[in-house]
Structures are given as C-alpha cells and as structure tokens.
Amino acid sequence: MIIGLTGKNAAGKGELANYLKNKGFIYFSLSDALRDEATKQDLDHSRDNLIKLGTEMRVKFGKGILAVRINEKISELSGKDIVVDSIRHPGEIEELKKNDGFILIGVHTDAKIRFERLVKRGRVGDTQTFEEFLEHEKKENAHEGAGQQLDKCIEMADTTINSNGTVEEANKDLDSYRNSLEN
C-alpha cells in the first residue's frame, strides 16, 4: 500500500506519517527532496525559498518532478508499505498514481489550529505571525501552472481526515479508513 498525504501547512500530515512509520511504512517526503535541492544550491531553507525552488523545478523539469524522484526510490521497494508526505501539486499526484495501490489522503485542519501548531513546532523558515501565516496560505493556494496548488490536491484526495482534534483521533480515523480498504 502506498499512502500519499496532502494538506495545508501544519495540518497534521507529519503526525500521520510518523504514525504510519511506526506501523512499518517506509517514509518519503517531497519537502525533504526540496530541502536537499536547496542545500545543494546553498539556499536558506525558509518557506519562501522552498516554495520558489519547487516552482522553479516544476517549470524546468515538469510539474511532477519531485514525485518522479520519489518514484525512482519507490520502484526499488516493491511490495512494501510506503507513505509519501508533502504532496503540493496535482502533477505530483499524477506521477504517484503510476504506482499500483496509491491512495491519496487529504488532511484538513482549521487555520487557527494549524497556526498554533506551527508556532509550537518552531521549524526554521516557518512564519512568525498569524497574518504572515495567512499570507503564505494565499501563496500556497492561488497558483496555477507550476506553483503550489494545495486546494486542488486536497480535492483530488480519495478521502479526507479531519485533524482538528488530537493526534490519536486522527490516527484512529486513518486506521478506520485503511481497514475499510482491506474489507
């Protein structure tokens, strides 16, 4: 089974990915692929830089380039359970769908809760104020072409998990969905 996770910043994708890793899933993140490329180019890992770099890579190499790089790794892991985090463009989804058994899960969490999580997380490159957070939301959702299109990705999801509550509640919803696929 290959599970892809998409959702807005601090929605809880990483928590669900960690839960699946603890259940034996092999983990890949498209954001890590971006961070690796930023390091190669000696760029700061700020959110703005990563968004810009992702757009540049999609223009230069194709809209699914980050997923193409992950698919190369997935192809070596036939039959393994895999989770792919940080899917932010429909082209990436199309590439990942080339894998048998790919399922896309959208993770939804209200903006205020996501901002509170982001502040608590304290990751380098994250925004500092709620207004900055909302401005970044616009950047992540208003693009056409090679830019991030999170709303479109969420619309393409096979199911959506609401992550407004506790991590345990979201994990339970994920397990329920996975069990429904096996029956």
Predicted regions and their residues:
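Small-molecule kinase domains that catalyze NTP-dependent phosphoryl transfer to phosphate-bearing small molecules
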Residues: 64, 120-173, 177-180
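ATP-binding Walker
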Residues: 11
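Walker A/P-loop
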Residues: 14
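Short, well-ordered beta-strand core segments
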Residues: 27, 104, 159-162
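Conserved phosphate-donor/acceptor-positioning beta-strand/loop module used by diverse small-molecule
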Residues: 85-86, 96-124
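ATP-dependent small-molecule kinase phosphotransfer cores
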Residues: 26-83, 87-94, 125-126, 131-134
